[in-house]
């Protein structure tokens, strides 16, 4: 069960794309922005800034759904959730580029990129992995660390849900009991 997650507050996003840059850097072989630019296979971001309502920037990333439609649609079983805290990750060695996961994802966050290291040099599915390697090292996800506006934060799921419930109650009734 996920206890902490990257919370997206699109109203605070300014579209600077620092989250995308830091995500790609965190998934590069060198883990260094300047060295990553020169790598033979360029790292790809797992978060993307799209256009949301009213033509405003919207940070879009995997929600690590439970149950996950992408995982259920993946015929070779390349999407698994046995990594820390139920994060859904793609086993790139098993991905056959059938596209089923991408079609099943309700948030359109699974992208396909060419990978010369994959068998036959084919394309593979890439999606947010929750920066599980950074979490294991005691760090927060790269996108949340990079975001200076607070549009992406790494927070306790239960606390965020309570804040949302309280905000709705205030809007509807004007008061909230503690």
Predicted regions mapped to residue ranges:
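Non-ligating segments of multi-cofactor redox enzymes
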Residues: 1-178
């Amino acid at each position: 069960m996920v206890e902490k997650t990257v919370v997206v507050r699109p109203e605070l996003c300014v579209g600077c794309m620092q989250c995308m840059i830091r995500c790609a850097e965190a998934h590069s072989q060198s883990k260094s922005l300047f060295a990553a630019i020169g790598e033979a296979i360029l790292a790809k971001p797992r978060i993307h800034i799209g256009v949301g309502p009213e033509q405003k920037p919207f940070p879009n990333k995997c929600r690590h759904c439970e149950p996950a439609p992408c995982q259920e649609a993946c015929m070779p079983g390349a999407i698994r959730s046995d990594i820390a805290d139920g994060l859904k990750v793609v086993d790139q060695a098993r991905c056959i580029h059938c596209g089923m996961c991408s079609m099943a994802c309700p948030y359109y966050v699974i992208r396909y990129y060419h990978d010369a290291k994959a068998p036959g040099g084919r394309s593979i599915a890439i999606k947010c992995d929750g920066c599980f390697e950074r979490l294991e090292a005691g760090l927060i996800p790269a996108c949340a660390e990079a975001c200076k506006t607070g549009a992406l934060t790494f927070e306790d799921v239960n606390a965020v849900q309570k804040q949302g419930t309280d905000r709705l109650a205030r809007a509807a009734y004007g008061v909230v009991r503690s």
